[in-house]
Amino acid sequence: MGIRTTVVGSWWIHADNEQDLARHFAGTLTPAESEALLIRAATKAIAEQRDLGLDDWSGGEYHTDNFICHLHRHLTGLEIIRPAESTISDYDDITVARVVGKIDAPKGLGYADAYKREKDLPGGVRKANVAGPLDVPIAALFSDMEAVKKQVPGLISLVNRELRGIADAGCPVVQLDAAVEGQFVNAGFMTAQHAADAIAACFEGVKAKKALHVCNGTLRGRPSVGALRCAPWVEILQRLDGVIDIALVEVKYFSQYQEREVFKALPNSMTLAAGIVDEACYWIEPVKKIRERIGDWARVVGEERLWVSTSCGFNRHPSRNIPVLRQKVENMVEAARTL
């Protein structure tokens, strides 16, 4: 029996698009130039993912900069304290802001616009993502956390609006990327119940298959928390029984692999998409090792409820890394098909 394969969302950036995407995020392209660039990049990403044999694919998330480092540009209610470094190397290089009013995105966060732009490209788009309510104000999250916390209900409404927009436009799978929420639970900053309540509210009224992605962060291969665990996330997922259809979970670290038995408590209503293959590791995981890992996870949740995925972060890589990333995906697909 073959195991279904997917990716988290972002796809690698090709050399012929690197400079143009940098200009897009710098705001030096015209709207027409940006639109043409994003269509060109997404078209290539969709074709590549399909050619590699993935069962589910995205538009590549080329409208995003380092996952969420661009989102302050869509928001009102923030004042920039320190702009991002010209080259983002670590978490202290991203934009820093403070809250000065109601945080909102009158023109949207860009995710629904991206899906509408990409859905009719050759091959279409099988899944689309939106950042979680604590991920959206990342520029102010650590510099003005108490002020951000007071606006969580409004941030949930903002994210919900974006998710519903994607679903209403016809996307088969709508995914919430609750990276910060997952990290806060791992670090003890948030309870599983608190995280689950926020996630469930984000999906209120969303008429599509619902996926949730949780991870420990990755920026140039670096996690953002020290507790590289996955077991605490099961407590979140148990509270989302009947809400979430697919749990796309980072399990690439050996410490997470050792906690796999906890996932026997995953609700029967959910599929587990196990993020086994590590995009950040310079080593190309052999087919044999990936197959062994898939088998071990299948013994926990059952083959019929298991998908396999890479970890998130493809679009944080320079184009010179593409041969390694591509081989990782090829090996994952082969391992999943030959289990």
PLM ranges: what are they?
Residues 1-339:
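Domain-level signal for soluble alpha/beta catalytic cores
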